Amino acid sequence: MAASSAVTANYVLKPPPFALDALEPHMSKQTLEFHWGKHHRAYVDNLKKQVLGTELEGKPLEHIIHSTYNNGDLLPAFNNAAQAWNHEFFWESMKPGGGGKPSGELLALLERDFTSYEKFYEEFNAAAATQFGAGWAWLAYSNEKLKVVKTPNAVNPLVLGSFPLLTIDVWEHAYYLDFQNRRPDYIKTFMTNLVSWEAVSARLEAAKAASA
């Protein structure tokens, strides 16, 4: 269902699609060393242990996520599987020299469904800023429309029947080394300097094709 490249059933920690210092000064190498190198790695390693010897061993991440969501009554492997998926999707949502305003069909759909890019920007930022505690904010595609959603902890739009297009991680470990408690500044920096609209556009095309 996702438009990103899926983490394989081997549950290998895939490196971000950029050098760990490539997003500076907007996201520091130190943040990536801890966030990707420690937190993301722990989700992958813990997932391997959880599914070893079970019927989930060897299954793709998306299968595990759907199988263990259990209508919100989460089964043990859900959090690590979803967090492993979410983080890979997050890294692929960014690029050096990113941000700014999208173009083409993506921009047209944002303007159609939110009345303007600026309204989308405000709604996405608000969702990310107001997610209480740990979680994520997303741009998603569902029923031929774009929508902004926020999810707690490890939950993602895959289990809500939507195609994720863009996400920002608002767990404190995502921004605390660079921004401390200034989550809104982190969100603004992400949107203006880091988002890969090319990745979002590619995911949109894949989502449209999958739902046709």
From Swiss-Prot:
Gene Ontology biological-process annotations: circadian rhythm; response to cadmium ion; response to copper ion; response to light intensity; response to ozone
Keywords attached to this entry: Acetylation, Cell membrane, Chloroplast, Iron, Membrane, Metal-binding, Oxidoreductase, Plastid, Transit peptide
Main subcellular location of this protein, as a coarse class: membrane
Pfam families in alphabetical order: Sod_Fe_C, Sod_Fe_N
The keyword Heme belongs to this UniProt entry's keyword annotation: no
Cofactor mode of binding and number, as noted: Binds 1 Fe cation per subunit.
InterPro entries per UniProt: Mn/Fe_SOD (IPR001189), Mn/Fe_SOD_BS (IPR019833), Mn/Fe_SOD_C (IPR019832), Mn/Fe_SOD_N (IPR019831), Mn/Fe_SOD_N_sf (IPR036324), SOD_C_sf (IPR036314)
EC number, UniProt record: 1.15.1.1
Swiss-Prot/TrEMBL catalytic activity: 2 superoxide + 2 H(+) = H2O2 + O2
Swiss-Prot/TrEMBL cofactor(s): Fe cation
Compartments reported by the entry: Cell membrane; Plastid, Chloroplast membrane; Plastid, Chloroplast stroma
Induction, as annotated: Circadian-regulation. Down-regulated upon photosynthetically active radiation (PAR) (e.g. light fluence) increase and in response to ozone fumigation.
Signal sequence range: none
GO cellular component, one term: chloroplast stroma
Binding site for Fe cation: 35, 87, 169, 173
Function: Destroys superoxide anion radicals which are normally produced within the cells and which are toxic to biological systems.
Similarity remark: Belongs to the iron/manganese superoxide dismutase family.
Record-given protein name: Superoxide dismutase [Fe] 1, chloroplastic
Organism encoding this protein: Arabidopsis thaliana (Mouse-ear cress)
Gene from which this protein is expressed: FSD1
